[in-house]
Amino acid sequence: MVLCGVCAFLGLYCTQPLLPLLETVFHASKTAVSLTVSAATLGVAIAAPVFGILTERLPRKKVIVASVIGVSIPTLLAATSQTIGQLIFWRLLMGLTLPGIYAVVVTYIGEEWPPQRMALMMSFYVSGTALGGFLGRVSSGVLAETFTWRTSFLAIGAVSLAGAGAIALWLPPGRGRPQPRPSAAGSLGDRRGVVYQVQELFRIRRLVATFAVGFNVLFSLVGVFTWITFHLSAPPFSLSTTALSYLFVVYLVGLVVTPTAGYIITRVGLRAGVAGAILCSMVGVLLTLAPSLPAVIVGLTLLSSGVFVTQTATQSHLRVASPPEARVTAAGLYLTCYYLGGTAAGSVPGIFWSLGKWPACVAFIVCMQAAALAMAVIGWRTQAAQAESAAA
């Protein structure tokens, strides 16, 4: 599970520490180079529901391995880009192959482990995503400054290919997958009514709230780590490409925090766990306004730790709230909303940057986090809790 998470996130955000460098190399605007981040997340958002529907009855392991191979190819080809437009294209293509990992791994975990261990196993997968995000960002920055930015893509693509081989060897085939059952026409499990199925999923209030929380969670993470690179590369910080890449060391905290969070969430519940995690992230974003680099690093650490815990809680809640016959499709819809948040974060904060630089970006992102907090606390209430509240 950890290796699946690493491969999923190794290349997704590898251009973040390179943005100031790419701005110079391609003589492009900040908004244009930020599209190298947005294009990848947009690809995930577009393909996620398709993967969810098409792969629901395919062998989970084969889909995961094929997707990791599919991710590595456009990553390698990105090194051949001669214009910013070509680089954006390869990033989009890479994103289109990623949902085969994301959507299917979440479902695989739900099928292979009992409910009482699901949050813990999900935390291991999320820890892998934290490690992958860290390795991708740091290696791309260091390799770009030591050699060239093209070397970064070649190295990440090669490692992804090796990861596909390791997953093929080590990941066991699914054992707990339920056998397909005939579905009544018009039911959520009816393959003839995909549109109907999606419509019914969006009628489940807890799922809609989960989709919205996912959108806002990734929006805050990508928004901060994309646009703060421009803030920290300018005076008074004036950080180099390598120094910017080392900021992502804070992702390693997620390797410790997230598994621990799995135990905590099991004890305190999903709503309380996600509320505390989002509040932690909000404090972290506000700390990045400090003129001190150590304070900024502490803020980024709190932000990323809170996001990883929120991911664990949200993905666990997704499994609980989804109808059993439509869990892969629900996971695909969640990923669409989640990565639409990442796509918007690559460009929308640019509007606020033009109005008031980094402080304006922070104000907007904190508002988005507050909205996510409200949706989780209110929207995740079970029917029993709502009935008790109404009776009171």
Model regions and ranges:
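Cytoplasmic helix-loop-helix junction between adjacent transmembrane helices
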Residues: W90-L131
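C-terminal transmembrane helical hairpin of 12-TM major facilitator-type secondary transporters
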Residues: R271-T314
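Helix-loop-helix hairpin linking two adjacent transmembrane segments in secondary transporters
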Residues: Q86, P115-Q116, F124-W170
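Paired small-residue
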Residues: G70, P74, G85-L93, P294-L302
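Juxtamembrane intracellular "pre-TM" segments in multi-pass secondary transporters
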Residues: P172-F211
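Helix-to-loop junctions at the C-terminal end of transmembrane segments
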Residues: A48-P59, V256-G269, W353
